Amino acid sequence: MPGTKVLFLRALAASSAAFFLASATAATPEEPMLLVAKRSFEDPVYGSTIVLARPVQGGGHVGFIVNKPTKLNLAELFPEHEPSKKVADPLFLGGTVDMNLVFALVETHGSRKDGAIPIAPDLFLAYETKAVDRIIESESDHARFFLGMVVWRPGQLDDELDRGLWFVDEPEAKLVLRRKTDGLWEELVRRLEARANTI
């Protein structure tokens, strides 16, 4: 397990994430979605991104960029945590909010009892320290780990959609957790552009 100081810092950081994510377990009139940035969306962070997004109570949304691997891995982040050394995949940049916190997306068929919350079909999100550690230790082959998340204030994502910045698609666990993300954005953009042209 990570050292006591690391656990304390991660637990402290999780408090702000919990503020946004705890309400995601409540029923909302919207479904999770996969956002694919359009070619015209020129932004240094969100241009050419794919974002798994979910509504939360109050009209806001939270999400995770799924195609921005970093050069950092779990072993570098937690050098004293032996299970982290076995995870070869890089950490991904989930977004610019709470970048000091590690989140885990894990594919699960059925329900979970470890505090992870459903975020999309067959996908659960863990942000509490113990739940993330458990996934690192025993489910890393079916998970992806992120630094940070995306947060939209109430109405903010609706405005971005009205401005035509995003394509919207249904999230699929296999696509969201695809190991090789090079070319994934271009693949989805081409598919969604073709779909839009047939409507």
Give each language-model segment a name:
Residues 10-22:
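Bacterial N-terminal signal peptides
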Residues 1-13:
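Bacterial N-terminal signal peptides that target proteins for export
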Residues 25-199:
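A short aromatic-anchored loop/beta-hairpin motif
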